[in-house]
Curated annotation (Swiss-Prot):
Pfam families per the UniProt record, alphabetical: DUF3417, Phosphorylase
EC numbers: 2.4.1.1
Record family assignment: Belongs to the glycogen phosphorylase family.
PANTHER family in the record: GLYCOGEN PHOSPHORYLASE
UniProt source species: Mycobacterium tuberculosis (strain CDC 1551 / Oshkosh)
Sample GO molecular function, one term: pyridoxal phosphate binding
PROSITE patterns in alphabetical order: PHOSPHORYLASE (PS00102)
Name this polypeptide is given: Glycogen phosphorylase
Chain positions found as N6-(pyridoxal phosphate)lysine: K618
Catalytic activity of the protein: [(1->4)-alpha-D-glucosyl](n) + phosphate = [(1->4)-alpha-D-glucosyl](n-1) + alpha-D-glucose 1-phosphate
Cofactor(s) required, per the database record: pyridoxal 5'-phosphate
UniProt KW Transferase keyword: yes
InterPro entries per record: Agluc_phsphrylas, Glyco_trans_35, Glycogen/Maltodextrin_Phosph, Glycogen_phosphorylase_DUF3417, Pyridoxal_P_attach_site
Gene Ontology biological process terms from the UniProt entry: glycogen metabolic process
């Protein structure tokens, strides 16, 4: 029979073991092996049975065992030491505090940052993630904690998390959703001074009110606030708003995003008030899902500070950072405009929004405008609400500038103000203990941030590096066999049929991993383009390859499920099933062993559709060699010695032809380059050339792929400038914000009437030479703006056959006087910087000291 209701009863700990509660509820244990070892020592078998979950362990352990441990001097000594270490970690000055103590930086660094994401992959015990976006967000929090960055994170608590994947007998993906009891997770409920749960409220249409309680997950030093709508105060339908991640229709999705954005800001206000913390100065949107946070902050400033909409928008923009993770328009949340209007529009007949009281509904809707007038674009809203934006690799930054060029019409894609911060991964989470121990021996500490530590790997005997790689491969093979057996049993097989699994996979065979989400562009089945060729590689008598595949398809994506089924059916064939497997239910625990044990990490997306691709970074962090299309981070950091590049047929329009070409290149690389190097051994059985690639990979990529590097980049290039801008706009009763908002209004009104009436060039000899002096003079009608309100630039560069400027350089032109009819004269003299076919033009841009860049407003007039 089934229980009517499920809940979790936590164990009562003996007083002497009270520190176990703090150690179990701060998720720092998930990346601190000594703490994990302490919990394992309580009951090793139960630790495995509980899936390495300290809260579950403490709830299930025999009370007599706890009483025994309360008298165990050795255990108590370890407990006290780890509790003291955690308290020291939470309070001691770290990198961020050292920067503040340095003096100059202290005035630039924000006092607090709010980080919003719809998913967070912090640890297996909190399955609030579906893929790379969530894992990246989790690594961001953990690295921010390790660096001492004062971050508060905000997301949603999904009662069913993300689905558990299994396979049917014929290889079709089947989804089941767990029921997660927050009382049984490392969470605490945010309560007020009276001990009552703090609730946030958001007014929806038809007089409905969505309420949510706030669970707090402590991620080291970083609190993660998770909003939960499954409370009695909500009507039945609204209780389901946070039921599952990516599980509903668009109506469900927009309600989640409204709660995450608007409710998330209100949750931060409640949390900082309860904890008596300084409110964050900078707000970071990890994708456009939480874009409504910017509108809620505008509402606060309009309601509480009495600002007009434009001035409030100016303050919000100055302190907001937007990160885009998608390289294709199809990856952007776009809602029907009619749906958005239902939530934000006039509910009372005065043109004001009920969702965001005090704000004109038409201004809210305009923030999400795009080319299709029937759509509301969340990424466009995010970009309009943020003064600073970035992609997640150098290549993705370029792709994003082209994709969002329409918001800065008149500018070349290279000039679109979207930068890049290449993603990184959290080493203590993803590096195998053997590598971390070697790092401690080389560095004398746990710090892996400095490149010099990685360079010390040259001291290590190749045989030792190979021993680590072989040990990790053996661990992976054991795990694969266990998972393979479980999967076959779930699909209806019996133990009597599964004797072959005991010898499936071989700890001495070249092991290739491919594990990720299964959208079409990642091309899960590229490896199957020529099944016979793949079979030859798997079964080669001298140089065999074994392949481990994993990944989840979105529940609504039957196309992705069909790709998985193709792989499963191939892997089920008796002649190859000992060399290739599809492992269901890809999650953090499986991923970790794959990154540790795979010799080669395969990635074959359609270029340039991979924004970053951090799975390959995690493999590199463990000495795995990447075999990848030059996309995402690999385009940036591949150097010819840290793996292999799969040639991409970028110019081929026929998709089938392109897949055939790239699959053929993949097979050739495996057969002719990868496998020979792996199996070439010296007299000690060590593949010297392979190990040197492993060493080179660790030395060159190790310090680059770290999330600590990524978070430092955000702090220095995005958070600190945003905090400085916020202090200027919010200081002195918002006078600077009012001035900038007024300037923007004047500029936008004048811009359609600005005219470059004439451009004159003088000074060049009859045959211009490189370095010859060119004088440009422009006559400009400013339509009421002052000369110091604009920047006039000469733009010079090589020209193609259509007279399009290539790689232009800009030269600022000085105001030299006023001509007839009120026209302003601007002039400059500059040496010709290039040889060959050269052209020039002149343009006018806005100028204001508080703009992050002259192209920020998207206004430009060309001659």
């Amino acid at each position: 029979m089934k229980a009517l209701r499920r809940f979790t009863v936590r164990a009562h700990l003996p007083e002497r073991l009270a520190a176990l509660d703090q150690l179990s509820t701060n998720l720092r244990w998930s990346w601190d092996k000594p703490t994990q070892d302490l919990f394992a020592a309580i009951d090793p078998a139960l630790w495995e049975q509980c899936g390495h979950d300290p809260v579950a362990l403490l709830g299930a352990v025999n009370p007599a065992r706890l009483d025994e441990l309360a008298l165990d001097a050795e255990f108590l000594g370890a407990l006290d030491e780890l509790a003291a270490d955690l308290n020291d970690y939470l309070s001691r000055p770290l990198w961020y505090q050292e920067q503040q103590d340095a003096g100059v930086a202290a005035q630039a660094l924000p006092t607090g940052i709010a980080y919003f994401s719809l998913e967070f992959g912090v640890a297996e015990v909190l399955p609030n993630y579906s893929g790379g976006l969530g894992i990246l967000a989790g690594d961001h929090l953990k690295s921010a904690s390790d660096l001492g960055v004062p971050l508060i994170a905000v997301g949603l608590y999904y009662r069913s998390g993300y689905f558990r994947q299994s396979l049917t007998a014929d290889g079709w993906q089947h989804e089941t959703y767990p029921s997660l009891d927050p009382q049984g997770l490392p969470l605490r409920l945010l309560t007020d001074a009276n001990g009552d749960p703090v609730l946030v409220e958001v007014a929806l249409g038809d007089n409905a009110v969505l309420r949510a309680r706030i669970w707090v997950a402590q991620v080291g030093r970083v609190p993660l606030l998770l909003l939960d709508s499954d409370i009695p105060e909500n009507e039945h339908d609204l209780r389901n708003v946070t039921d599952r991640l990516y599980g509903g229709d668009q109506e469900h999705r927009i309600e989640q995003e409204i709660l995450a954005g608007i409710g998330g800001v209100r949750a931060i206000r409640a949390y900082t008030a309860v904890e008596k913390l300084t409110p964050p100065e900078v707000f970071h949107m990890n994708e456009g899902h939480a874009g409504f946070l910017g509108i809620e902050r505008i509402r606060e400033l309009v309601t509480d500070a009495g600002l007009d909409f434009d001035t409030a928008l100016t303050v919000v923009r100055s302190s907001t950072v937007f990160t885009t993770h998608t390289p294709v328009p199809a990856g952007i949340d776009r809602f029907p405009l009619e749906m958005v209007q239902r939530y934000v529009n006039d509910q009372r007949g005065d043109g004001r929004s009920r969702l965001l009281p005090g704000l004109p509904a038409d201004r809210i809707v305009a923030l999400g405008a795009e080319d299709d007038p029937a759509k509301f674009n969340m990424a466009h809203m995010g970009l309009r609400l943020a003064q600073r934006a970035n992609g997640v690799s150098l290549l993705h930054g370029r792709v994003s500038r082209a994709m969002f060029n329409e918001l800065w019409a008149g500018f070349d894609p290279d000039e679109v103000p979207i930068g890049s911060v290449t993603n990184g991964v959290h080493a203590p989470t993803w590096a195998a203990p053997q590598w971390l121990q070697l790092g401690r021996e080389l560095a004398g500490s746990d710090s892996l941030r400095e490149p010099v530590v990685w360079q010390r790997l040259h001291q290590v005997d190749p045989a030792h590096l190979w021993w680590i790689r072989s040990q990790l491969r053996s661990m992976l093979v054991e795990d694969v066999r266990a998972r393979l057996r479980q999967s076959w049993l779930e699909r209806g097989a019996t133990d009597a049929e599964l004797g072959w699994i005991a010898t499936a996979f071989d700890p001495n065979v070249l092991t290739v991993g491919f594990a990720r989400r299964v959208p079409t562009y990642k091309r899960l089945t590229l490896m199957l383009r020529d099944p016979d060729r793949l079979e030859q590689l798997l079964l080669d008598e001298q140089r065999p390859i074994q392949l481990i595949v994993a990944g989840k398809s979105h529940p609504a994506d039957d196309g992705g499920k069909a790709l998985i089924q193709q792989v499963v059916r191939f892997a089920d064939r008796p002649q190859v099933r000992h060399r290739i497997a599809f492992l269901p239910n890809y999650d953090m625990s499986m991923a970790r062993l794959l990154y540790w044990g795979c010799d080669v990490w395969l990635n074959n997306p359609l270029r340039p559709l991979e924004a970053c691709g951090t799975s390959g970074m995690k493999s590199a962090l463990n000495g795995g060699l990447n075999l990848s299309i030059r996309d995402g981070w690999w385009d940036e950091w591949y150097d010819g010695e840290n793996g292999w590049e799969i040639p991409s047929a970028d110019g081929v329009a026929d998709e089938n032809r392109r897949d055939d070409l790239e699959a053929g290149a993949l097979y050739d690389l495996l057969a002719q380059a990868v496998a020979p190097k792996f199996y070439e051994r010296d007299e000690r059985g060590v593949p010297q050339r392979w190990v040197e690639m492993v060493r080179h990979t660790l030395q060159t990529l190790g310090p680059k792929v770290l999330a600590s590097r990524m978070v430092r980049d955000y702090v220095e290039h995005y958070y600190a400038p945003a905090a400085q801008s916020f202090r200027r706009t919010a200081g002195a009763q918002f006078d600077a914000a009012r001035e900038l908002a007024d300037y923007r209004r004047r500029a936008e009104e004048a811009w359609p009437k600005i005219e470059i009436a004439d451009v004159d060039s003088t000074g060049l000899p009859d045959t211009p030479l490189l370095g010859s002096q060119l004088t440009l003079t422009a006559t400009v009608r400013l339509a009421g703006l002052r000369p110091n309100d604009v920047t006039v630039q000469g733009v010079l560069g090589r020209v193609d056959a259509g007279d399009v400027l290539m790689d232009p350089v800009t030269v600022e032109m000085a105001h030299t006087g006023t001509g007839d009819g009120g026209y302003e004269i601007f002039s400059t003299t500059t040496p010709l910087p290039l040889a060959g076919p050269v052209g020039y033009t002149v343009r006018v841009l806005p100028r204001h000291p508080m703009l992050a860049a002259s192209n920020e407003l998207g206004l430009v007039t060309l001659a």
